[in-house]
Amino acid sequence: MTRKIMLQGTGSDVGKSVLVAGLCRLASNHGLSVKPFKPQNMSNNAAVADDGGEIGRAQWLQALAARVPSSVHMNPVLLKPQTDVGSQVVVQGRVAGQAKGKEYQALKPSLLGSVMESFEQVSAGADLVIVEGAGSPAEINLRAGDIANMGFATRADVPVVLVGDIDRGGVIASLVGTHAILPGDDRRMVTGYLINKFRGDVTLFDDGIASVRQFTGWPCFGVVPWLKSAGRLPAEDSVVLERLTRGGGKALKVAVPVLSRIANFDDLDPLAAEPDVDIVFVRPGTPLPDDAGLIVIPGSKSTIADLDDFRRQGWDRDLDRHMRRGGRVVGICGGYQMLGSRVADPLGIEGGKREIEGLGLLSVETEMAPEKTVRNSRAWSREYDVALEGYEIHLGKTTGADCSRAPVEIDGRPDGAMSADGRVMGTYLHGLFGSDAYRSALLKSFGIEGGGGNYRRSVDAALDEIALELETVLDRAWLGTLLG
């Protein structure tokens, strides 16, 4: 029989995704067939699953940790925010429509069937399924029709382990408070809790464990230290971008404007892992640095709205100065679209303006269309004559004179555009920098030798290190029950 456990957080960004990935790798290392599952995710960092269709990037990573092919059923409902109040709704890998907050609350109950169908698919043949919740079950205002936390756990009869983040402070109050406000049926699903991101002498929290036990009756299944290896894993949520920014006199500074609806910013992770590269994620209200050698404009869930914001920040003027200083620019997906002379949305797919003037660094134009391209791709860099692997997730078609200098071939067809002087290029291919040979060639073009280490191997090693750490610190009896 398949064993099942669900990690739910006392809040967002408590580290659930990393813990699920670590537990998946730990179980796999013990010879178990283990699979991850997240009923509902909200993220613009999407991946293309091995069976086609979109899932959250975290579930793709968790499948990698579990050493199993990724599937759209591992994340049956994916919400991709397009505006401050609305999201694109992806169900079992395919776009099902768009919904604003209240509309989605009404829609949720109808999605439970798809969620349960996917859960059955994932569970089939697995020894263990590790489920990740979303946000917190303490948000009882969202409990009606819930499919992400306790609504799913009670329906699927999956025991819950709460995760509290001690690094942000108030972890005892968050655990006890969650116990206090959960309805009785939900509270009974909780079997215990984990403390995450602890720094220092773990015995200093012994009294804390006793206090939580006194108020809730819940046992502690482990105090997990701050996992340094997690810094080598792709991040899923834009709330962590400040922590990803590096700085300090490296050979190459790469500036990345943080767009309001930034998508797939984990494209930059392989560059950030390079010892001679500084990645600077530039928040709104801050100019693009004048000492950057390369500016990367990342993907966007709403290209036209983000291009409006780009100008509002004055980043277009910063970009012009960067070009006059001899700098280089790469645009990926939505960032590529922005680099052209015009972006048109005649059908109103993005829900805002129908047309906007582009940044004018490439002689191309983009027109949005309802057909969405979602696929894993094998590609070739014409620029550096090396093989690439990546994926495409985009709406729209880009055409123009600079497309004649396409920097990439995807499955044998030209993709992207490059300026005549070679300093500006754009492509729809995500994962470009994750190809070691391409990254090495790019760094050499900036005078950096020795780059392009095996990024995938580094991620895999980080997962093993996290699994080993968890095996050391987690309660042995609980872990034994989990692993069988």
Swiss-Prot record:
SUPFAM superfamilies documented for this protein: Class I glutamine amidotransferase-like (SSF52317), P-loop containing nucleoside triphosphate hydrolases (SSF52540)
UniProt keyword list: Cobalamin biosynthesis, Glutamine amidotransferase
UniProt cross-references to InterPro entries, sorted A to Z: Class_I_gatase-like, CobQ/CobB/MinD/ParA_Nub-bd_dom, CobQ_GATase1, CobQ_N, CobQ_synth, GATase_3, P-loop_NTPase
Positions annotated as active site in the UniProt record: C333, H430
HAMAP family cross-referenced by the UniProt entry: CobQ
Stated family: Belongs to the CobB/CobQ family. CobQ subfamily.
Designated name of the protein: Cobyric acid synthase
Upper lineage: Bacteria, Pseudomonadati, Pseudomonadota, Alphaproteobacteria, Hyphomicrobiales
